[in-house]
Amino acid sequence: MTLEQMYAAIGGDYKGVMERLPSADFVRRFALKFLQDDSFPNLKKALEAQDAPTAFRAAHTLKGVCQNLGFDALYVPASALTEALRGGTLDGADTLFPPVEQEYQRVVAALKELE
């Protein structure tokens, strides 16, 4: 799978990320680093532990990484979850987290095909 195909498969903004970052090799390298990013596992653990402040930090980090990499289909639900957690409570997290998890799994699967 090419980098552009991977972005299409995940609903990402290939054109936008290519305008922001210097080269396809650079984008590919940083996109693959997403597989080692711990913000999603930290988010999931924090939600399971009912730890709203840690969940907020993890969701905010995930949102930022997705925005920088042009992972738009994951950025949108991660952003919604971040805003819900911003107030320091878990209100709404039970309904907002599943779309984040679904899109995260889709991104991870596509990135593994890119390797």
Language-model segments: which ranges?
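Two-component system phosphorelay core
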Residues: M1-R57, T61-E115
